[in-house]
Curated annotation (Swiss-Prot):
NCBIfam families on file: ArgJ (TIGR00120), PRK05388.1 (NF003802)
Positions contributing to substrate binding: 149, 172, 183, 263, 386, 391
Record-stated family: Belongs to the ArgJ family.
Pfam families membership: ArgJ
SUPFAM superfamilies: DmpA/ArgJ-like
EC nos: 2.3.1.35, 2.3.1.1
Gene: argJ
Function, as annotated: Catalyzes two activities which are involved in the cyclic version of arginine biosynthesis: the synthesis of N-acetylglutamate from glutamate and acetyl-CoA as the acetyl donor, and of ornithine by transacetylation between N(2)-acetylornithine and glutamate.
Compartments (UniProt record): Cytoplasm
Protein's UniProt keywords contain Cytoplasm: yes
Protein name: Arginine biosynthesis bifunctional protein ArgJ
Marked site: Involved in the stabilization of negative charge on the oxyanion by the formation of the oxyanion hole: 110-111
UniProt-listed InterPro entries: Arg_biosynth_ArgJ, ArgJ-like_dom_sf, ArgJ_beta_C
Length: 391
């Protein structure tokens, strides 16, 4: 059901002729029917942020969003004033259709960078999507398909609070995924009665521990956007801790689905660093290992090459993550192949047949801070997808 799982939301996904793939659904519309229109958002940290990101940041700033329109088939990034004008025109069209103000409408785009969108197609698609709006499971599924690019499957989540309020969500993302958000568009909906301030606080923490801790290929997008919308249609004001927990669970589920659909990936790699002096230190170490293309290639070949793990680990400056390299241990899928900074058990003992590969690194500093990041292996298929990619 995706974004329509929570009460008070309708959605649609249509083929607007934006994508180069004929007949592909490429435009989604999500409308919050209230009674609340509270909203929160987090956006890309890329300095070349796209026009729709610039627009949507302003929209979300006041904590109110009545609708989100999303397109695949073009990023509308690095398109200057003309691109920004397209985002404004899109918001104005949707606002007119639903009886709202333009600054109540967020705009999201994904696809090829550097080209303007076919605006006539976008605006006509917005009208078609408005006519197709429904609060059904099928409508939510259509919306999740419409935002896909190199994704092989839609990614959705549905959760229910202890007293009946709900969270639903959808995300797109398969490649160009790196920490600090990436090329993903995510819309999460809830029918809980919550304030925009509470939502922003919950989303910021949830994103930091989910979307900001995945890395498919080390490439940061210009367009990533995560929006959390509340309709209040359940009439239920949830326990604050439970609300925060379910938002975090929703983000964790969606981010893991991105890793599970990484472009061409044959292994999902979980890297957990323990025994660090701080969580930031553990995170820096985990990200350094996750960024190693040499390691990703080795994992693709079913080779748990611990030398590539520790060499990447060693690039983290000591002032960022102090540790003694002679005390570091590395386990892969439960087998300790690096002991005290040197060889441990033979790496041929590691079972590499599961889809998930677990790399556990203990810095043994005497402290107990830890962090986990996820990444994928690097395959021939990844190169093929990105050599041939066009929106």
């Amino acid at each position: 059901m995706s974004v329509t799982f929570a009460q008070g939301f309708s959605a649609a996904g249509v083929a607007a002729g934006i994508s180069s793939v004929e007949g592909k659904k490429d435009l989604a519309l999500v409308v919050n029917n209230g009674p609340l229109d509270a909203a929160a958002g987090v956006f890309t940290s890329n300095r070349f942020c796209a026009a729709p990101v610039q627009w949507s940041r302003k929209v979300v700033a006041d904590g109110h969003v009545k609708a989100v329109i999303l397109n695949s088939g073009g990023a509308n990034a690095c398109t200057g004033e003309a691109g920004y004008a397209q985002s404004v025109a899109t918001a104005e069209t949707v606002a007119g259709l639903i009886g709202a103000e333009p600054n109540d409408v967020a705009v999201c785009s994904t696809g090829l960078i550097g080209e303007l969108l076919p605006l006539d197609n976008v605006l006509a698609g917005a009208k078609s999507a408005h006519e197709a709006l429904a609060a059904t499971a099928e409508a939510g599924t259509d919306a999740s398909h419409a935002i896909m690019t190199t994704d092989t499957k839609p990614k959705t989540v549905e959760l229910t609070g202890s007293n009946g309020w709900k969270i639903g969500g959808m995300v797109k993302g398969s490649g160009m995924i790196a920490p600090q958000l990436a090329t993903m568009l995510c819309v999460i909906t809830t029918d809980a009665v919550v304030s925009a301030g509470q939502m922003q606080a919950a989303l910021a923490v949830a994103a930091e521990h989910s979307f900001n801790r995945i890395d498919v290929d080390g490439c940061m997008s210009t367009n990533d956007t995560v929006l959390l919308l509340a309709s209040g249609a359940s009439g239920i004001e949830p326990d604050k801790d439970e609300f925060n927990k379910l938002v975090r669970e929703a983000c964790a589920s969606l981010s893991r689905q991105i890793i599970g659909d990484g472009e061409g990936a044959s292994h999902d790699i979980r890297i957990t660093v323990t025994g660090a002096t701080s969580e930031d230190a553990a995170l820096a170490c985990g990200r350094a290992v996750a960024a190693s293309n040499l390691l990703k290639c080795a994992i693709s070949g079913n080779d748990p090459n611990w030398g590539r793990i520790v060499s990447s680990l060693g690039t983290v400056p000591p002032e960022v993550a102090p540790y003694d390299s002679n005390k570091v241990t590395v386990d892969v899928n439960g087998v300790r192949i690096c002991e005290n900074g040197g060889a441990g058990r033979d790496r041929s003992e590691v079972d590499m047949t599961p889809r998930e590969v677990h790399i556990d690194i203990d810095l043994n500093t005497g402290s107990d801070a830890e962090a986990t990041v996820w990444t994928d292996d690097l395959t021939h298929e990844y190169v093929h997808i990105n050599a041939d990619y066009e929106s």
